[in-house]
Amino acid sequence: MGGLIPLGDVSRRPARVPLVTVLIILVNVFVFVRELMGGEAFVTQWSAIPAQIFSGHGWITIFTAMFMHASWSHIIGNMIFLWAFGPEMEDTMGRARYLVFYLVGGIVAMLAQIAASPHSNVPNLGASGAIAAVMGGFLVTYPRDRIRSILVIFIFVKITFIPAALLIGFWFLTQLFSAGQVAHAQSGGVAYLAHVGGFIFGAVTARLFESTERRSVASSV
C-alpha cells in the first residue's frame, strides 16, 4: 500500500496569515466534535440525503454537509489537503472572495453528488468537494509550483517535491475514473462525483475570484 500526502507549496509563501483557511479548519473540527457528541441522529439530520432533498426537504443540508465528516481519518485527511493548497488560494483571491469560492465550490460539489443518485438514502457529507474546488483553482493558478509531499510505499517513507500540475492532475484523473465506476452506487463510500464537480468548478472559476489587485498586476505583465 502507498500514497502521497501533500504538505504545502514550497515555491511561494502567502503574504499574510491565512485566517479564513484556519477558520474553516476550526469550524470543521468543532462540527466533528459535535458529531461525536450527537451520534447518528446528528449526522442524519445535517448530512445531505438525496432522496430527502429531491422530495423537497432538507435543502439546508447541501450547505451543512460540507462541514460534516464520517471519521477521524476523513477529517484529518481533508484538513491536510486544505492546508496544503488553501493558504495560497486565499492569498491570491483575498479573504472574502476565497470564502465565497470555497463555500460555493462545496455546494456545487454536493449538488453534483446528489444529482447522480436522486433516490439514494445514503447520507453525503464531507469537505472534500469544497477542497477539490480549491485544488482545481490551484492547478490553473500555480501549475508549476512545487508541492512538498510525503511519499509512502509500504514501509518506505520519503519527502519529495512534485509539480502541482502533476500531483493535482493525477489526483483528478483518479477521481474521474473512480466516479465513472460508482456513479450510480447506492451504498456508502467516497463521494467521487463531488470531487469531480468541485474540481471542475474551481478550475473554471478561479480566475474570476482573483483579487482586483492581482488581476491588475497580471494584466500589466
Give a label for each model feature:
Residues 1-221:
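A detector for small-residue-rich transmembrane helices and their helix-helix packing motifs
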